[in-house]
Regions:
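Conserved acyl-donor/pantetheine-binding loop and adjacent beta-alpha core of acyl/acetyltransferases
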Residues: 60-99, 105, 115, 155-162
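Conserved catalytic-core motifs of GNAT/GCN5-like acyltransferases
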Residues: 72, 132, 142, 147-162
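Conserved glycine-rich acetyl-CoA-binding loop
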Residues: 87-88, 101-115, 124, 139, ...
């Protein structure tokens, strides 16, 4: 496990877009990964809804989490593609991805990012945080207090989601 001081946790900037999009392509299958333009639009619309773990030693983004705020209680596939659905100040956050580069996986970084993101949303007054995931990730997210609500109606990327 890395020491926490190794990382700077921060919001996204326009300078991060290319690297964020590249990490998206590494961490998700081709049909699931958001395009460069979709990542760019989300960063431009709400950079504060990204939490980046920047590795100070290797001078690169090690991982990140992103979300979108909405008054909805339904996780819409359109959240991935349409950054204009962002409702600043809405009390619900929908997590769009937790990505950690392969060389940083298994060292506790995803948990650090998740815990910090939850804290960040609580400080903002967010009332509910929603996410979808593949079945094998349900135990990971349950460990953070997420309640498994069963199969999601989402078909993002032609996949089945929980």
């Amino acid at each position: 496990m890395y020491k926490q001081e190794r990382y700077i946790f921060r919001a996204a900037t326009e300078e991060d877009i290319r690297e964020l999009a590249a990490i998206e392509k590494i961490c998700f299958s081709e049909n699931e990964a958001c395009s460069y333009e979709e990542v760019k639009d989300r960063v431009e619309q709400a950079p504060e809804d990204f939490l980046i773990a920047f590795d100070q030693v290797n001078k690169k983004i090690a991982g990140y989490m992103s979300g979108i705020h909405s008054g909805s209680e339904v996780f819409l596939d359109e959240f991935f593609q349409n950054a204009s659905l962002q409702e600043k100040g809405a009390k619900h956050c929908f997590l769009l991805g937790l990505e950690v580069r392969p060389e940083y996986q298994g060292k506790g970084l995803a948990s650090q990012i998740m815990n910090r993101y939850i804290d960040m949303e609580e400080e903002r007054g967010t009332e509910k945080i929603f996410l979808t995931c593949h079945t094998h990730f349900v135990p990971f997210y349950s460990g953070f207090g997420y309640e498994h609500l069963g199969k999601s109606p989402s078909t993002w990327g032609g996949e089945s989601w929980e």
